[in-house]
Amino acid sequence: MMNWKKTALAGMIAVTAAILIAGCGSQSQKQDSQKMPDKIVIGLDDNFPPMGFRDESGKLIGFDIDLANEAAKRMGVKVEFKPIDWDSKEAALKSKKVDMLWNGLTITDSRKKQIAFSKPYMKNAQILIVRADSSIQTKDDLKGKVIGTQEGSSSVDALDKDQGFKNSLQDVKLYGDFVAALMDLEVGRTDGVLVDSVVGRYYMTKKEGKFRVLAGSMGDEEFGVGMRQDDTVLVNKLNSVLKEMSADGTMKKLSEKWFKTDITIPVQ
């Protein structure tokens, strides 16, 4: 009987050891899979000035482009920018067509359920823009009117949160990008545009005297970088680099380059 107990005990010890070894191996493999990549692919809407857009020669430029290039340099990785359908951005990230969403991406509770966000780095707001010669003076004056906005944007989320205002409108036209929406506003196809402040105000500087902003906003926001929820090493590394660039004045310098003022958030 004693020999049987010894044999059973030895067997249990062997099985336990095997499980522990397998567990260590699994943990090691998990850690290996979480190593920093040699290259990151950034998904963006390449018609989203001044965050990411193309100049007259077709070169990709903008605040987020400059910021992402500097971040990649400090992380020691190569970077590729890949234009995507912004309305399907979460799918592009999940399917690994891209590794990051970095293009004036608003942090929202609904998006947090699908993707991991970096720490916020910039302030934004949702604003209503009308033509300068319009009789519309307030948000309430848009009752029975047509406004435009970008499909899949946080402007749509802001509109959905204000059902009273949305239901008062005659129609809401959705566009592939804000620039197209603002162009339609300029020629009179719509009466107003709900747009990210950073985009709308930048566009207005290129069209002086054409537009004006209605008083107030439809919500304050913060921008962050979107990543896959299981890419914890990448998330942590980027947060560290963003904090560094915030502390050393790099973000402030880039913001002043593109916005003439510092609208970044101190990254903690």
Question: Could you describe each region identified by the protein language model?
Answer:
Residues 26-30, 154-173, 212-214, 243-268:
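Ligand-binding clefts/hinges and TM-proximal coupling segments of bilobed small-molecule sensing domains
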Residues 65-74, 140, 145-146, 151-154, ...:
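Extended ligand-binding regions for polar small-molecule ligands
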Residues 46, 123-130, 197, 201-243, ...:
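Periplasmic-binding protein-like
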Residues 54, 68-77, 155-175, 204-208:
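Ligand-binding cleft/hinge of the Venus flytrap
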Residues 105-113, 160-161, 184-187, 191-220:
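A ligand-binding cleft/hinge motif common to bilobed small-molecule-binding domains
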